[in-house]
Amino acid sequence: GQPVAVCLDWADVVRDGIVWDFFGAVTIVRRHLDTLEQQFGRRFSHAATSFPPGTDPRISINVLESAGLEVSHVLDEPTAVADLLQLDNAGVVDIGGGTTGIAIVKKGKVTYSADEATGGHHISLTLAGNRRISLEEAEQYKRGHGDEIWPAVKPVYEKMADIVARHIEGQGITDLWLAGGSCMQPGVAELFRKQFPALQVHLPQHSLFMTPLAIASSGRESGGAICKMNCRPRSFRRSIP
């Protein structure tokens, strides 16, 4: 049940939780399968995938099937994280590249979920406007200058926190878990702690990998799958340990 490899790519194939570059997404998945085959000496044939709440799961499924994979398990992203962490009376906030997923978990079950069209892409847009640079340059710049860009992007995260507040109001939760690559921006955890002083706010050390790990874990527990991977294509640099 331990993760043994990860494949990540920087690519603009998903916007606001929707795969807009289908061919590009399929190409990335096939390339990752080639890399894993070289590493492990076998071609993986099955995969688990996920989708943002409120979107069509067939989008992710179609990408995997077009890449030659059989889909063994499908669930929404906040539910995957909630199952992995075995939460109770907690909220999950998954700030991804294009959307922010919010889920409420009671006694291990997701009782409420929603998805808002704001995420890392909107951070990049704000940074591009602030520095008068291209969107691509902003994407590159924000990865290595977190502390420096915080004053410029903080208002966007404040808006995200306000959105989360509306969704969790009256839900009676005690903990709030942050997930997703955009949560790794320095200052985000402290901002959420100030916004929600009555809650215990948790930010895992590697929140970037929280959702893919949760999806892989859910696929493993469903049985029958050979390979589980987060195949909702996102924008990360490929790295194989």
Features from the language model and the residues they span:
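Short beta-strand scaffold segments in enzyme catalytic cores
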Residues: 1, 100-104
